Amino acid sequence: MATTIDARALAAPLVEALLSTAAEQIRAAAPRIAGLPASDAAAVLPADLLPQVRNFLLTMVKEGLSGELNAVAEALQTYLETGRRVIDASVTSAIELSSEQQERITSELRRRYGDVHVTYHVDPTLIGGLIIRVGDQVLDNSLRARLSAVQRALQAS
C-alpha cells in the first residue's frame, strides 16, 4: 500500500500548541492591561509574547475591548477542547480517481458525516473497488476483500 503524509495531521499538534500558548498569554496579560490607555498598555506587556498576541492585545485595548480578553482566552480554550469536529476520511482505490469521482465521494461523505477532510490514496493491490475509512469505521468494498471472503467461504465448506 502506498504511504502518503497527511500534512494536516502533522500540523495539528503545532496548531494546538500555538492556540494554547495564545490563550495562556492573553489570560496572563488581561489583568495587566485592564483599564489602561492604549499608549500605556505596550509598556506593561511581557517581552516574550508571541508577536500576534501582542498585536491582538494592543488592538483590543485600542478598541476599548480589554474587558473581553478573558472571554477570548476562554473561547480559544473551548476551541482547543472541542476542535472544529472535522472528521478525517481516507479513500483508497486501485486506480487514480478522476476529479469528478473524488467530488462525488467527498460530497456523499459530507452528506453522511458533516465536515469531513478526505484524502485519496492509490493501492493497485486492491484490484478494484474502494476502501473508505471515516474515523474508526472502515468500509472495504475492494475486489481483493470480496475475493478473500469467497476464498474463506470455500475453505470453510
Curated annotation (Swiss-Prot):
For this entry, the protein name equals ATP synthase subunit delta
Subcellular location field: Cell membrane
What the protein does?
F(1)F(0) ATP synthase produces ATP from ADP in the presence of a proton or sodium gradient. F-type ATPases consist of two structural domains, F(1) containing the extramembraneous catalytic core and F(0) containing the membrane proton channel, linked together by a central stalk and a peripheral stalk. During catalysis, ATP synthesis in the catalytic domain of F(1) is coupled via a rotary mechanism of the central stalk subunits to proton translocation.
Family under the similarity heading: Belongs to the ATPase delta chain family.
Presence of keyword Membrane:
yes
User: Which top-level group of life is the source organism from?
Assistant: Bacteria
The alphabetical list of record keywords is: ATP synthesis, Cell membrane, CF(1), Hydrogen ion transport, Ion transport, Membrane, Transport
Q: Which Pfam families match?
A: OSCP (PF00213)
- Membrane topology recorded in Swiss-Prot or TrEMBL: Peripheral membrane protein
Native species: Chloroflexus aggregans (strain MD-66 / DSM 9485)
PROSITE patterns, sorted: ATPASE_DELTA
Q: Which GO terms describe its molecular function?
A: proton-transporting ATP synthase activity, rotational mechanism
Q: Report the main location listed first in the record.
A: membrane
**What's an example GO cellular component term for this entry?**
plasma membrane
Q: Which InterPro entries match?
A: ATPase_OSCP/d_CS, ATPase_OSCP/dsu
Subunit structure comment from the entry? F-type ATPases have 2 components, F(1) - the catalytic core - and F(0) - the membrane proton channel. F(1) has five subunits: alpha(3), beta(3), gamma(1), delta(1), epsilon(1). F(0) has three main subunits: a(1), b(2) and c(10-14). The alpha and beta chains form an alternating ring which encloses part of the gamma chain. F(1) is attached to F(0) by a central stalk formed by the gamma and epsilon chains, while a peripheral stalk is formed by the delta and b chains.
